[in-house]
Amino acid sequence: MSTTFCSSVSMQATSLAATTRISFQKPALVSRTNLSFNLSRSIPTRLSVSCAAKPETVEKVSKIVKKQLSLKDDQNVVAETKFADLGADSLDTVEIVMGLEEEFHIEMAEEKAQKITTVEEAAELIDELVQAKK
């Protein structure tokens, strides 16, 4: 075995593939004079990062959903609850969004509001909009 000093690290990415070359800047015991890995793989065109909403936001959204849909107090509405599973139609969903906007003093863009299907999605969007106002 021999000690090899390498000093380059590079990464090249395109919309369809990524090539990564890994080299070492510190002495490394290897049997070749250069150690590198070439990896080719597809890179997704979109990256989505989702963060859980604050528990207090989820709780408020649940209460508003119950109120807007005239649900009983003992009806279980949690983060994963889908509006459709509660019997909400598109008009009900619009009313839920209006109630949320009023309660949290925010305005939801129509295209984002139309994508909301669960309590969690509504709470995440609300947290995002409230944070953006600060």
Swiss-Prot record:
GO terms for molecular function: acyl carrier activity; phosphopantetheine binding. Signal peptide: none annotated. Residues 1-51 form a transit peptide. The modification O-(pantetheine 4'-phosphoryl)serine is found at S90. Carrier of the growing fatty acid chain in fatty acid biosynthesis. Belongs to the acyl carrier protein (ACP) family. This is Acyl carrier protein, chloroplastic. It comes from Brassica napus. The gene is ACL1.A1.
